[in-house]
């Protein structure tokens, strides 16, 4: 489980193509969200609008086969007190980044 920081991941979305054709982009967004939640143990996952538009760019029937993402993890205090919330913000990565810890 990575602590607070920024990480680069490559998410394979080929499995989406096994499903029904009209639900592929919806399932791809859900798979990205579940992948980030599993790898970062985040309570809340926020997907950036640019990543969402990239997945939906080729219509709902033909999402990309894989996506390179940057995940920023931070812990936030709730306003009313209580436990800290672990939040992951997911955005689209550039092509030259290698998977692993991102320093930048």
Curated annotation (Swiss-Prot):
<dbReference type="GO" id="GO:0003735">
    <property type="term" value="F:structural constituent of ribosome"/>
</dbReference>
<dbReference type="GO" id="GO:0002181">
    <property type="term" value="P:cytoplasmic translation"/>
</dbReference>
<protein>
    <recommendedName>
        <fullName>Large ribosomal subunit protein eL31</fullName>
    </recommendedName>
</protein>
<comment type="similarity">
    <text>Belongs to the eukaryotic ribosomal protein eL31 family.</text>
</comment>
<dbReference type="InterPro" id="IPR000054">
    <property type="entry name" value="Ribosomal_eL31"/>
</dbReference>
<dbReference type="Pfam" id="PF01198">
    <property type="entry name" value="Ribosomal_L31e"/>
</dbReference>
<keyword id="KW-0687">Ribonucleoprotein</keyword>
<dbReference type="GO" id="GO:0022625">
    <property type="term" value="C:cytosolic large ribosomal subunit"/>
</dbReference>
<dbReference type="InterPro" id="IPR023621">
    <property type="entry name" value="Ribosomal_eL31_dom_sf"/>
</dbReference>
<keyword id="KW-0689">Ribosomal protein</keyword>
<dbReference type="InterPro" id="IPR020052">
    <property type="entry name" value="Ribosomal_eL31_CS"/>
</dbReference>
């Amino acid at each position: 489980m990575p602590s607070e920081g920024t990480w680069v991941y490559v998410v394979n979305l080929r499995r989406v193509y096994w499903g029904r054709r009209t639900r592929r982009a919806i399932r791809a967004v859900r798979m990205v969200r579940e992948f980030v939640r599993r790898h970062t143990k985040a309570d809340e996952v926020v997907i950036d609008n640019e990543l969402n538009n990239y997945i939906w760019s080729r219509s709902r029937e033909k999402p990309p086969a894989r996506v390179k993402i940057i995940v920023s993890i931070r812990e936030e205090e709730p306003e009313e007190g209580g436990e800290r919330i672990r939040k992951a913000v997911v955005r689209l990565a550039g092509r030259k980044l290698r998977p692993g810890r991102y320093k930048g």
